[in-house]
A protein has these predicted regions:
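Glycine-rich beta-strand-to-loop/alpha-helix junction loops that act as flexible
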Residues: 57-60
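Catalytic core of pol beta-like nucleotidyltransferases
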Residues: 1-53, 63-69, 79-119
């Protein structure tokens, strides 16, 4: 049995790998665009329905090179009444079924989370 790969076979393999890498990159760009649109909708909703004062996106959705299939949308919120938190999260999760939203109340966030938000 001959297990050697010819240069032609190797080029076919490499071309396929390049094509898959390009498709993955395009998919992540689209995911980031959708995530940013959902973030805008979320900010409007939080301000309008819950009186939030400020909303900031942070985390992997901001950086294409860190974005992956399981990336969620991390939002920091100021001025949300703690009693409204779960109701707000429920509304945010209904904005797009493919984008999970992680809502962080800045006033009660742990220091290491605040550091990430500030970056």
């Amino acid at each position: 049995m001959n297990y050697q790969i010819t240069p032609e076979q190797m080029e076919i393999y490499r071309a396929g790998a390049r094509r898959r890498r390009q498709q993955e990159q395009e998919r992540m760009v689209k995911k980031q665009q959708i995530g940013c649109q959902v973030a805008k909708e979320a900010a409007e909703l939080l301000k309008r329905e819950f009186g939030a004062q400020k909303i900031v996106i942070f985390g992997s959705m901001l950086k294409l090179e860190k974005l992956h299939d399981r990336s969620d949308l991390d939002l920091a919120v100021w001025g949300l009444n703690p009693r409204d938190y779960y109701r707000a999260v429920g509304k945010l999760l209904s904005l797009d079924p493919d984008i999970l939203v992680d809502l962080v109340e800045v006033e009660s966030a742990k220091p290491h989370i605040l550091k990430v938000i500030e970056e």
